[in-house]
């Protein structure tokens, strides 16, 4: 499995190119090391070809929260509303860097990895 890795503002990014040059690309917000396991599991099901970009080293309570909010659980931290900044990082840096390493532009993009 061909793999390209890079960092963008502290986020770790792993790119697993699809077999077809214009395969769709899926951006997965995940934990370190999970991208390859997810890709392998999906390929075992016989799903259509796609490229996977696994983004990790996330601050879940900041990067995935659109606004400040109190902790959801007694022993967890508050949500700090950094989703807009993360979305900017994703669209302005991660996507261009990742797709610049692909053979051609993807047919479409998707995003996954958070409830």
Tell me the role of every PLM-derived stretch:
Residues 1-115:
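Non-catalytic cap/lid and distal C-terminal segments of serine-dependent acyl enzymes
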């Amino acid at each position: 499995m061909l793999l390209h890795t890079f960092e963008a503002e502290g986020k770790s990014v792993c790119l697993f190119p699809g077999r077809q040059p214009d395969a769709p690309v899926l951006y997965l917000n995940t934990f370190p090391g999970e991208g390859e396991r997810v890709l392998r599991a999906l390929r075992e099901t016989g799903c259509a070809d796609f490229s996977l970009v696994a983004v990790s080293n996330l601050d879940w309570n900041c990067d995935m929260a659109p606004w400040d909010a109190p902790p959801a659980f007694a022993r967890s931290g508050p949500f700090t509303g950094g989703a807009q900044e993360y979305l900017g990082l994703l669209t302005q840096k991660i996507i261009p860097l990742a797709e610049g390493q692909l053979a051609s532009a993807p047919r479409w993009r998707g995003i996954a990895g958070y409830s």
